[in-house]
Every structure is written in C-alpha cells, then in structure tokens.
From Swiss-Prot:
One of its GO terms (cellular component) is cytosolic large ribosomal subunit. This is Large ribosomal subunit protein uL30. It comes from the Bacteria. The keyword Ligase does not apply. Belongs to the universal ribosomal protein uL30 family.
Amino acid sequence: MSDKKLKITQVRSIIGGTKKQKATIQALGLGRPHYTVERKDNPCTRGQIRVVQHLVKVEEV
C-alpha cells in the first residue's frame, strides 16, 4: 500500500467548515480550490481524506 500515491485536489472552499476540517486541509497541504498535492497512500492520509471528503477529489496515481 505504501508504493501507491494519491493525487488530492481541493474542489470546494473551506469557508463555513469546522476548525477540524480547516486544520485537516492545511495538514494535507491544500488551502484553496484547485490546489493539488500528491501524498502516500497510507491509513493516516486516508483518515484525513475521510474528514474532508466533501471538499476534495482523490485519484490513485
């Protein structure tokens, strides 16, 4: 599972989100809509994605 990477793109704004969601977006390295980052596919990253799943789009690379 560690060989794979995830391409995470923020598709919605964090305005109106909870503090936890804002902190998670920042921890993922995002901040504005259409920002994209690549992260290792591991349980920690998957958990962060689950918190903000309505704000991001995830693709396997």
